[in-house]
Amino acid sequence: MRHVSVLHHREEPGMGAGVRAVLGDVSGEVAVFGSLNADLTVRTERFPKPGETISGEDLVILPGGKSANQAVQAGLLGAHVRMIGAVGADGHGDLLIESLQRAGVDTSAVQREDVATGTAIITVDSAGDNTIVVSPGANGTVDVSTAQRHQDVIGKARVLGLCMEVSPDAVEAAARIAHDAGTRVVFNNSPFHPVLSAGLLEAIDVLVVNEHELADMLKPGASDTAAELECERADDATDWADCARRLAAMGIPSAVVTLGGRGPMVIEGEEITPVDPFP
């Protein structure tokens, strides 16, 4: 079994090159509200069949959780970051706290709960495909009251980072607190939710999605205030100007649309800007 250092936090689009293109530089006070997980990964030649036991390589334990990954990225970029969330009173919780602190993240708003730390059980086969089962653990204790208890942290931040790995009600509560305080809300819609409440949509300053998720969000009925049609396409190319108009109709002023290895597309009002992948 191997434990791996802070540098092995996965890079999340929530603080990537596209978001930095919108915000300028990710500096000053940044708050991140959400999930912390220990990623337990085993590589194996193939996935087992139902009821089958097979051998794999050594277990690798990585610090993770989409929100924790965002916090580490922002910390390594020089921002003063405060993480708001929860871990268990166990070794995985210790690993996550230590990894955040090594990146310069303030963990004083991370609660230690009398439950297991959230974990992701990941199996990777020889082709690089994976299966993931997430046990929320302490992340399940992050609720609306968590956001309310830390409204001073959220309100003093220049930017609030959010994703959807904790309760949607808690995410909306944190977003509303930030919006009312003038804090910019960067919302990474991951794990993807095609339907978002009007209250959350109104609070989002920067939406982060991939191109397929964007199309799903812009389908009829995808949200309380959704535009009527998904982005029109011509010659198999996305009509980014049309996407921008439809996002504006939903009340979202800016978006970062990730395109895999091609780098993200940044939408700011009517401006459409391709951004080179961050090295």
Annotate the PLM regions.
Residues 2-10, 16-30, 194, 222-279:
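Conserved phosphate-binding/catalytic region of the ribokinase-like
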Residues 41, 133, 216-220, 267:
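Residues that scaffold the ATP/ADP-binding catalytic core of kinase and kinase-like folds
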